[in-house]
A protein has these predicted regions:
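Amphipathic alpha-helical scaffolding segments comprising HEAT/armadillo-like alpha-solenoid repeats
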Residues: 2, 21-33, 53-65, 85-97, ...
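Short inter-helical turns and helix N-cap capping residues of alpha-solenoid HEAT/ARM repeat scaffolds
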Residues: 4-5, 36-37, 68-69, 99-100
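Structural detector for internal amphipathic alpha-helices that build alpha-solenoid repeat scaffolds
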Residues: 6-21, 30, 39-53, 62, ...
Length: 132
């Protein structure tokens, strides 16, 4: 993860996701927080979203609100919409005030995705309760 070539660092991040497991999250979160290259951080945010563990939420929240790159904030917001949670929704509501339009648009999409998942979940529960 400390290789001088950003392409190698990006691939290493993606490979960690391929190996899977929640124990990989701290390594990817460190890349998201500390890598100098915004493309590498963007891929780390994407990767955390793909993993969909609740433990990915804190680093994604931090990046959505604080990363200096609009490119990374946008991807972290989208990833929060994939993972979903009360905390994710609160953060995405804050991201609606981001100065960069792509981040705001990503927050809108992410919130819509969370709402859809919540509706789907409620429908599944209703179907189970009613035998439908």
């Amino acid at each position: 993860m400390n290789h001088p070539d950003y392409v190698v660092r990006t691939r290493a991040t993606c490979i960690l996701v391929d190996f899977g497991g929640e124990d990989k999250i701290p390594h990817i979160a460190q890349v998201l927080k500390n890598d100098d290259n915004e493309l590498v951080r963007h891929e780390a945010a994407f990767s955390l979203g793909q993993m969909s563990y609740s433990s990915t939420i804190p680093p994604l929240i931090d990046s959505t609100l604080n990363d200096p790159s609009m490119f990374v904030r946008h991807e972290a917001a989208i990833a929060l919409g994939v993972v979903g949670s009360k905390e994710a929704k609160e953060t995405l509501q804050k991201a609606l005030n981001d100065p960069d339009k792509p981040v705001v648009e990503s927050a809108v999409i992410a919130l819509s995705n969370i709402e859809f998942m919540e509706t789907l979940s409620k429908n599944e529960k209703f179907a189970k309760l009613t035998g439908g």
